[in-house]
Amino acid sequence: DHRDLHSFPTRRSSDLEFAILQLFMQNPGRALSREDILTSVWGRDYDGELKIVDVNIRRLRIKIEDNTANPTYITTVWGYGYKWGL
């Protein structure tokens, strides 16, 4: 099942959520650490908490996953980060 950005339901996404999704699409199958995501999306100068990545991943999953309890697109790599699951 191959999907791209255009096949997802059209639900309003924030620029940050779109940037995260784009990062995953540019790195298919590669596990990205929370730090990788934070640096790529928020920039090196961001001085906030790493938890902001988890919060935005959760919001993105609500919009694209059929079952957020068992995600198929954005999967968790425990103790590391996240991976685009397709």
Roles of regions detected by a PLM:
Residues 1-13:
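Short, small-residue-biased leader/transition segments that mark boundaries at the very start
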Residues 11-12, 18-80:
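Positively charged, aromatic-enriched patches within helix-turn-helix-type DNA-binding elements
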Residues 82-85:
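Conserved active-site beta-strand element of glycosyltransferases/polysaccharide synthases
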